[in-house]
């Protein structure tokens, strides 16, 4: 895996911060951010996604909350 650092929360302290990397081999974004709280998880389940798709978060996945200003570090298509 060849990760390339794209950016970190500019307001970072020493407690960890939202960070974005790009996997140059797959084009995947790798994101470190805040764990979603129970209210966020409930809202995700309520809104849902595509018809016929479970609203439960599978064991091998998680939901994170990324501050909107971190989008500046996402690659442009």
Residue ranges with predicted function:
Residues 7-10, 24, 33-35, 68-70:
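Generic secondary-structure microfeatures
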Residues 42-77:
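Helix-rich interaction surfaces within compact, conserved domain-sized segments
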Residues 3, 28, 63:
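A residue-level signal for beta-strand positions that form part of recognition/binding surfaces
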């Amino acid at each position: 895996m060849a990760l390339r650092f794209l950016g970190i929360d500019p307001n970072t302290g020493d407690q960890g911060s939202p960070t974005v990397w790009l996997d140059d081999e797959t084009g995947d974004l790798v994101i470190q951010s805040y764990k979603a709280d129970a209210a966020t998880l409930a809202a995700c389940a309520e809104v849902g996604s595509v018809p016929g798709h479970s609203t439960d978060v599978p064991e091998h996945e998680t939901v994170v909350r990324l501050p909107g200003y971190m989008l500046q570090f996402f690659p442009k298509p």
